[in-house]
Amino acid sequence: MGRKWANIVAKKTAKDGANSKVYAKFGVEIYVAAKKGDPDPESNSALKFVIDRAKQAQVPKHIIDKAIDKAKGNTDETFTEGRYEGFGPNGSMLIVDTLTSNVNRTAANVRAAFGKNGGNMGASGSVSYLFDNKGVIVFGGEDADAVFEQLLEADVDVDDVEAQEGTITVYTAPTDLHKAIVALRESGIEEFQVTELEMIPQSEVELSGEALETFEKLYSVLEDDEDVQKIYTNVDGF
């Protein structure tokens, strides 16, 4: 699958650490997970999963606690998940996942972001068929074979395990991501750099020059939208 997760994680963490918008987005995601189930992460696996991801992105504890406290209250604010697909310059493609309290606003904003920044919105499924839905786990380690065997023994549907420069990357079936995390924790792994459900491109494109500048602007505008939770792309390095 060829993605250099260690480098991508380092870039993302450096950016996320200084980005209050990321904190706000995680706040919404934590609120939704806590509202749907028990506000205690020890009895709500979906909430625990989101909190773990928030910690990986260096979201402060008070942001996490505030979102959980909000879910415990009497607020009836509701959020709806959405997915948009589209195209950028020179064969670049994007999948945009959203979580919003106003679907019409979000749809208009995403469409405008594509239209005003060198992209084109596509129909549902126009891009996603060229991506594979996988669970991705990244942590420090060297022995990919041993990790693969541990996961098989735990009856995890694991697709691949890669070792690169002191980092292990595990790819699982999306339905087995949680099972894999539990199995790895039971084997002694305490800290993860990434625990995500990802849409991984079947092939990547490299952009340079004006095409790269156009794509970066499109990506940045989408990322800055408060309703956009995740962006998947086939552009190398993103």
Swiss-Prot record:
Cellular compartment(s): Cytoplasm
Keyword Cytoplasm: yes
Molecular function GO terms recorded: DNA binding
Keyword annotations from UniProtKB, A to Z: Cytoplasm, DNA-binding, Transcription, Transcription regulation
Gene Ontology CC terms: cytosol
Gene Ontology annotations of biological process type: regulation of DNA-templated transcription
Cited Pfam families: TACO1_YebC_N (PF20772), Transcrip_reg (PF01709)
Similarity annotation: Belongs to the TACO1 family. YeeN subfamily.
NCBIfam families reported in the protein's UniProt record: PRK00110.1, PRK12378.1, YebC/PmpR family DNA-binding transcriptional regulator
Name of the protein described by the UniProt record: Probable transcriptional regulatory protein SPH_2064
Species: Streptococcus pneumoniae (strain Hungary19A-6)
